[in-house]
């Protein structure tokens, strides 16, 4: 079991089980120096330290070294003798995530002809594509620690229903 744990610390990537997620948070904040980060073609990796985005890795394979990626030098863990970085890593999908449904009550209006109160409801379907991964992490994921699709789509649905307008 120890060999698998060591191997897991050498390679940083979103697991296959997270491929359908909009955001996946790497579970360990201690990242070994010279570990390899693998970012899928439809994702980016966002590095956060103390509530700030420190850097973004584009798709590809990257060796985590401060010489190759200068922003890593800002969060070297000196307690480890400089052999590790302390950072949160979020893998953010940049492809389109389709077929999310929403629906709910909008408002009550009075029918001018009959005088009856009518409850208006709306239903629809939407897709999500993350245009700015840094903003998503800073404004939604990082502040309320939301990383699963249900929580993110719940927030989006609430935003859609809150921006209602009755004509």
What residues fall within each predicted segment?
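Extended, charge-rich, solvent-exposed interface segments
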Residues: 152-162
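Conserved small/polar residues in nucleotide/adenosyl-binding loops
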Residues: 166
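Interfacial loop/beta elements and low-complexity acidic/Ser/Thr-rich segments
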Residues: 1-141, 145, 151
